[in-house]
């Protein structure tokens, strides 16, 4: 190839690549709906009437967003029970990336947890003093369910919680809606630090949002590892007795629950939009 042809080829390749990048960058983001109304996070989809749902899995999983000047509200509707996987045990993680790179460097895990009375009292004391009389009444209960959130670092590990008196907490609730399960989330737009819950982008700004749930829980992983060790030991014993160790090893540990994850590019609404 001559030098002239080489330059023409390189220029054409650069033009094609530039067009592809421009097309990718120009992909239309999903618009969040602006709201001036006070939103009650209760897991009820009726509060979202008039706001269109976007399908991730047709007839399976849908989602929607709206925001005011301080808060992003997200709705996740799992219509087909097969997509729930182990969501009750794993909870739902929302990832936010204001750079649009779909990075999992920052996430918030939302999960319903059961606390014994002492753990629940400790949780309440993070928000303010609890009288001895109230503690005595709480200790009479068997336990408490808490719709809990934890900020996760780039390794997916919980960070040290910021006092709720110093930062607005994220909130979520979920409820059945016929055969579907409805998850509703509220996250402050402002993120004071990577220890606090927040989207990290303001009204009118773009942000990539990721949803993730399901898969193996830590208990499942430990149980599977234990079963594999037991099978390996039994197979070795079977081999020592002159039997066929493959009979033991072929039993397996059963199917692994699926983990579901997807991202969307979101354009936060601003007043008057």
Where are the regions that the model predicts?
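Structural preference for beta-rich elements and adjacent junctions enriched in aromatics
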Residues: 24-273
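Bacterial N-terminal signal peptides
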Residues: 9-20
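Bacterial N-terminal signal peptides that target proteins for export
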Residues: 1-11
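Serine/threonine-rich, low-complexity intrinsically disordered segments
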Residues: 4-6, 18, 253, 266
